[in-house]
A protein has these predicted regions:
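Structural motif
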Residues: 175-177, 206
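Catalytic cores of nucleic-acid endonucleases
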Residues: 183-211
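Short beta-strand segments
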Residues: 98, 157-158, 180, 209-211
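Serine/threonine-rich low-complexity intrinsically disordered regions
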Residues: 3, 15-16, 187
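Short conserved micro-motifs at the rims of enzyme active sites and ligand-binding pockets
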Residues: 129-131, 180, 190-191
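Conserved P-loop NTPase motor "coupling/switch" region that bridges the ATPase
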Residues: 1-7
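Accessory nucleic acid-recognition modules appended to NTPase machines
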Residues: 7, 12-175
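Active-site donor-binding loop signature of nucleotide-sugar glycosyltransferases
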Residues: 122, 181-183
């Protein structure tokens, strides 16, 4: 699942990596052209692909339109943050990516700082990046996000203390749950780093570490 994703028909090609990649590429290109470019009346397919590649590479990492625009500009493609905002909205409207905002757990308010993005399918991410071994930790984090979304939770990134955050604050039926996700916590310092944000939360809602 981490490598191939969850499109039902794609399971026919688990033993044929080329056919699997071609199938996912067909879905990807159809979404970009019909659901992103045509529906939103956008003109720059190269920019859309650049943004999709950037978001796929930075799944689970804080990003902003300005940060992306600066990166594109430094790579020789001058782009304004307003343009990036428009194209990012188109990618999320097409449900190719999901935007997750940050939430101050103590202050109980949404923050206007950098958001995180998660892709709709891990197989698509691997196809876009051309690899199946790109940052397993964020792959697992992406999978947990999609499962929480499937179960009907409203999801935010939680600020739990000074310089610390919880991967997911999941709310459903007026009940809150907190989730930390890590590829491995065998190292004691990693375990402590993952548990610290949960320990800083003073309420009695359930808190989970998934690894």
């Amino acid at each position: 699942y981490i490598n191939t994703g969850a499109f039902p028909y794609a399971t026919r090609f688990v033993d044929n990596s080329l056919a699997h990649s071609q199938y996912l590429e067909g879905i990807y290109n159809t979404v970009l052209v019909k659901d992103v470019m045509m529906r939103e009346n956008l003109k720059d397919i190269t920019l859309v692909k650049s943004l999709a590649s950037f978001l796929a590479s930075n799944v689970g990492s804080p990003v902003s339109a300005k940060k992306i625009a600066d990166t594109l500009t430094s790579n020789g493609r001058p782009t304004g943050s307003a343009t990036v905002d428009t194209y990012l909205e188109a990618l999320t409207d097409a449900y190719l990516f999901y935007k997750v905002n940050r939430y101050d757990i103590k202050g109980k308010m949404h923050l206007k700082s950098e958001s995180k993005y998660y892709i709709c399918d891990t197989g698509l991410r691997n196809m876009i990046l051309g690899t199946t071994n790109k940052d397993i930790g964020h792959q697992i984090e992406n999978i947990v996000y999609l499962e929480l979304l499937r179960r009907g939770y409203t999801i935010n990134i939680g600020k739990s203390g000074r310089g610390t955050e919880v991967d997911f604050v999941a709310i459903r039926d007026k009940k809150t749950e907190y989730y930390q996700v890590s590829a491995s916590v065998l190292d004691e310092s990693t375990l402590e780093r993952e548990l610290t944000p949960l320990k800083q939360i003073k309420d009695s809602y359930p808190k989970f570490l998934i690894t």
